[in-house]
């Protein structure tokens, strides 16, 4: 079900089965020429059906729809390659896009664990059952990269991108 939050701005609640988070709030901006979906849910059938139902209720044509992913976690990115069409742009942070390019993704974790003696077979089992891996996009998305301060316009809305990294460029964690 889609709830109108403001004129032209809607929320679709996407269930996240077996997750302590319970649901993801996916936001949809209906524009005159293009629509924008913000975050998609896990790449699972139940999530896909909830999203499709909400989009159908709103009369969203995916051929006229772009996507913005707020960060790299599978509950936010999982369905994007199932929903996006040839005409869709997928907006994503330049920093988080490195994960999908292999700089800081699952393979780095696997390599690190193996170098430090974690048994490869156990690692593959653990990875196969991890929801962040299991429910991620089917294929690598093609991104339109965003940087801090960039603007996205859709309908009556202008969204400003604000980078809020927990790691600096050298990989040091920020705390405080």
How would you label these PLM feature ranges?
Residues 2-58, 173-176:
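Conserved beta-strand hairpin/beta-sheet module of binuclear metal-dependent hydrolase folds
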Residues 7-14, 129-135, 155-157:
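Short Pro/Gly-enriched beta-strand edge/turn motifs at strand-loop
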Residues 8, 29, 39, 71, ...:
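Divalent metal-coordination and catalytic microenvironments
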Residues 10, 89, 144, 158-160:
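Conserved beta-strand segments of alpha/beta enzyme cores
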Residues 19-21, 144-146, 164-168:
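A short catalytic or substrate-binding loop motif that flags glycine-/basic-rich loops and adjacent residues
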Residues 34-36, 66, 157:
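Structural motif
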Residues 43-47, 56-152:
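Active-site HxH/HxHxD metal-binding segment of metal-dependent hydrolases
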Residues 149-175:
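Core dinuclear metal-dependent hydrolase active-site scaffold
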């Amino acid at each position: 079900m889609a709830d109108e939050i403001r004129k032209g701005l809607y929320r679709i609640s996407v269930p996240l089965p077996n997750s302590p988070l319970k649901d993801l709030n996916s936001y949809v901006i209906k524009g005159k020429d293009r629509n924008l979906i913000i975050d998609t849910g896990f790449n699972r059938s139940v999530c896909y059906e909830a999203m499709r139902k909400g989009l159908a209720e709103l009369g969203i044509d995916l051929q006229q729809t772009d996507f913005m992913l707020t960060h790299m976690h599978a509950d936010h990115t999982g369905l994007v390659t199932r929903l996006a069409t040839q005409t869709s742009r997928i907006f994503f942070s330049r920093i988080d896009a490195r994960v999908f390019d292999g700089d800081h993704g699952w393979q780095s974790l696997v390599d690190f664990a193996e170098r430090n003696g974690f048994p490869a077979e156990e690692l593959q089992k653990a990875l196969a059952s991890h929801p962040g891996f299991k429910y991620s996009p089917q294929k690598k998305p093609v991104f339109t990269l965003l940087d801090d301060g960039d603007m996205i316009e859709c309908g009556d809305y202008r969204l400003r991108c604000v980078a809020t990294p927990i790691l600096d460029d050298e990989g040091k964690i920020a705390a405080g």
